[in-house]
């Protein structure tokens, strides 16, 4: 029987906030968008279908700004307390609406090409880990498994997942970590805190940050306590080869050190942890490539808007409020 490891079947995140494998045609990015929007915003991006390649020259949407990023109102609420800061963020948004010149467009295309290479390696790595953590089990009445290798322990599965996929305790970050940071960066700009208005990146700073993540080799590579040179020294040959190919083709990147040394990237990671950005096609890249999606998903989508309910909250402490149907002005006040 097919018995997949539960650790690769379950992810945590906000299913409504994430980046996708969608792209813009380069000609749409050469001029400012209509109605003061950034380039390309008048036209929906095209999806790169599972198993297909990105069209030549097209640019991934999560490398580009959106006119709703860091969008706060100056009237009421936070606008009364931070009007000047919000005006600075508004000025930043206006700066994003100009078209890209030939040099910047070439940079975006090179970054998109780097994403393609990292995505292919991530998909291959995820597929291999899934195969190695799926145990064949005999079930009466079912066909014999093709292979009856001994099952791996949960500890070994966890170890493989956390080190090879999430690069925990490893100097060179996996393709997954690098891609996730880039996609998280795009999401984080929608939630950029007002009190961090002076750290929001200019267009050139954003491109430079993306180059550090995707192309690498900008920081020293000395080890620190508890870290390993690349990945497990006891790793299988295929995993070792993938790590060497990754360094040769996409440079050396330590995501954790990048985030420690860069205020912006550190804030991106903090916002990602807080809001739980979830990129479906990245989290299940091998499944999307193999079958285009899912036959069945189980979870708790955030369909219900979270609101404050005086009666419901206070009745947890004093049930009489709910039982007697007291209105707000009749609720007892406790010191």
Regions of interest found by a model, annotated:
Residues 1-335:
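SAM-dependent methyltransferase catalytic region
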